[in-house]
Amino acid sequence: SGSTGRTTVGQLLTPAGQLTTLGDLPLNEALSPDGRYLIVSNNGQGTQSLQVIKTATGKVVQTIPYKSPESLYMGLAFSPDGTHLFASAAGNHKIRTYHFDCGKLVETSAIQMPVVSPKLTKVNLYPAGLAVTNDSKRLVVADQLADAVSVIDLATNKIQTTHIGHRPVWVTLSKDSTKAFVSSQGGADVAEVDITKSQPLATHKINVGFHPNKSVLTPDGKSLYLSLIHI
């Protein structure tokens, strides 16, 4: 009431803004490069979904549902020109890809993540956080259950994977897209990964508080802000 609003999970906000009703367990969102649309990934029980919200009105203009066993996860990333969106589908061992135009998503061919290692052992990469390089040529993936990070060549879908940290969950790229900063929830650290080589290379580890999650780089590229679930 008045200037205070209540969110769908019971939190009180003052002053109250506009609330948009979403699906179950929204874990992540991605703003289109032009700022006109917000994509939300809903990752709860039963039917999961992607929703497209028009930022000028707060209205949901498209919902794409996925019934079990099809799934989504927290990874969402636009190409720099805003024409393509990538969404992780961890339970399905793939990255979903979409064409995006005028507020509408059209799903195209998915990128299949490997389920067998070069040594022919079973692997479950469980793709989580995603980031696209400035030239739109590569997609960087945090492989949460494999303790690894992968770089995908978007022209060939060739995947190069390097082991890092413990339970990596989020990826943020440097301003020039030469480095990836990968948050490891189980390792209480952020790994700095050189992605300019044919094989990604972890070069530095930054120890942070317990359970690091999402991060964002300042516009000048000099500072990385990180959310910690437990301190």
Regions found by a protein language model. Name each.
Residues 1-15:
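Blade/loop signatures of beta-propeller domains
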Residues 54-58, 100-103, 153-157, 195-198:
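Short loop/turn segments that connect beta-strands within beta-propeller blades
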Residues 34-36, 81-83, 135-137, 176-178, ...:
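Short coil/turn segments that connect the beta-strands within blades of beta-propeller domains
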Residues 229-231:
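Conserved small/polar residues in nucleotide/adenosyl-binding loops
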Residues 18, 64-68, 108-122:
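Surface-exposed loop and turn segments in beta-propeller and other repeat-based domains
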